[in-house]
Amino acid sequence: MKSELHIIRNAKPEEYGTAGQLMVQVYSQLEGFPKEDEQPSYYSMLRNVGDFTAKPDTELFVAVSPTGNIDGSVVFFGNMQYYGSGGTAIQEKNAAGFRLLAVNPNTRGAGIGKLLTVHCIIRAKELKLQQVVIHTTKAMAVAWKMYEKLGFRRSEDLDFMQEKLPVFGFRLKL
């Protein structure tokens, strides 16, 4: 997928570290989101986000600027069995999911988060799946609004607690 300024594609192995560092930067700056000293294992997972690609049907997408900067990333799961979050999401059948969407703070407002999200939706349709499952938190208010505008609907059956953090589930029927 392509925008006027960014191309969305699979990350190359040599880009995994950059994508992970971007995720750490973005998530650690979210007001109301746990910091690294509160959830060190979560931040370790972010740093090592490329490890997800070793799982079947799992892809790391990046938004690449014309100058080669990685300005966004997201992990796509073509099989919810490998989604790896809390709650019941891993039991969803005929569904895709995505997690860990992050956009460079210097490029926010340019539609990169939407491009990455739409790319995941298109990928789920290519795989002939019936729904896309995601999670977000209250700290991610901008993403929450974007997901709703794209047609995602709250699904309380997917909610869970990540230590002390409430995590809210959403579905998009395809």
Model-derived features with residue positions:
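C-terminal "cap" of GNAT-fold acetyltransferases
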Residues: K12, Q25-Q29, E92-K93, Q130-V133, ...
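Conserved GNAT acetyl-CoA-binding A-motif
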Residues: T117, A124-H135
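Acetyl-CoA-dependent GNAT
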Residues: N10-G17, Q21-L100, N104, T117-H119, ...
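Extreme N-terminal starter segment of soluble prokaryotic enzymes
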Residues: E4-I7
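Conserved amphipathic alpha-helical interaction elements at protein-protein interfaces in regulatory
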Residues: Q29, G109, I122-E126, R153
